[in-house]
Each structure stands twice: as structure tokens, then as C-alpha cells.
């Protein structure tokens, strides 16, 4: 069981991380997120997430506006363990009007995956300390690749 912290002072030397992922939602601490830097990314919304208790900062959640089922079922290979599976996306089902989206229809438990294109990946990597937190995996799209963030 965890403890509920009502003040940042209860953490001692621990500090609020710059990034977090909670239930597949991507959070960025507000002091390092420049909304103007992300304004060119298509298909996202930014929502303020207040931290309960006495914390000096809030987070901004990067929310994908689209949930897309674009799994190429012919070329994808599903195994019992997802790490052994091969995901291939059907490019014809991905609208050009989005730089990132939640992938539907792949996880057997119904979880969505965050999928971003190269433009969004590069925009995110320009954020302060992003290279320390963000990990991307290339996935195949009908012979090309896209990034799984």
C-alpha cells in the first residue's frame, strides 16, 4: 500500500518528476511544457491536471483526440505475450490529420497504445529532460515505420 502525500515537503529529497504516465495518459509538468511548442501537433488536446495536496506545480495531460483501430491483421502476429508479438499498422486507416492517437484493437485486455508519428516524436523530444523519460519503439506500417510512444 502507498501513502497519500498532502504536501511536497513530505517527500524530503524526492521531487515531482518532469514526466509521468498514468493509465496510458502522458503527463508533463507544467513548468517545462511550452504550449506554443506543441501547437503544431495535430490531434491532441492539453488538459490541466491538479495534484492533490500542497504541491507547487500542476501537470498538463497530453490527450489524443482520436482512438483508431488500424491494426493490419494480415501482417500482424499476436502472441500470448505482447513483447513477442509483431504489430503492423494499416496506413490507409490512419488519417493524415493526426500526429498521434490511441491505438484500439491490439491489446487483449482493451488497453490503448499511444502511437505518434515522427513530427510529434521530435516535438516531444525537444522538451526539457525528455530524453531521460521518453522511450519510443519503431513499429511497422505497411512497409514503413511509425513510432510507438
Predicted regions: what is each one?
Residues 1-149:
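Phosphate/anion-contacting hairpin/loop surfaces
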Amino acid at each position: 500500500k502507498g501513502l497519500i502525500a498532502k504536501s511536497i515537503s513530505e517527500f524530503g529529497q524526492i521531487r515531482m518528476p518532469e514526466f509521468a504516465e498514468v493509465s496510458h495518459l502522458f503527463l508533463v509538468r507544467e513548468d517545462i511544457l511550452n504550449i506554443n511548442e506543441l501547437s503544431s501537433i495535430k490531434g491532441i488536446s492539453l488538459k490541466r491536471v491538479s495534484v492533490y495536496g500542497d504541491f507547487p506545480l500542476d501537470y498538463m495531460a497530453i490527450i489524443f483526440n482520436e482512438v483508431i483501430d488500424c491494426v493490419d491483421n494480415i501482417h500482424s502476429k499476436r502472441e500470448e505475450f505482447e513483447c513477442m508479438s509483431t504489430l503492423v499498422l494499416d496506413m490507409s486507416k490512419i488519417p493524415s490529420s493526426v500526429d498521434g492517437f490511441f491505438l484500439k484493437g491490439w491489446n487483449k485486455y482493451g488497453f490503448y497504445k499511444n502511437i505518434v508519428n515522427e513530427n510529434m516524436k521530435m516535438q516531444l523530444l525537444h522538451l526539457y529532460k525528455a530524453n531521460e523519460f521518453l522511450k519510443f519503439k519503431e513499429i511497422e506500417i505497411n512497409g514503413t515505420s511509425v513510432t510507438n510512444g
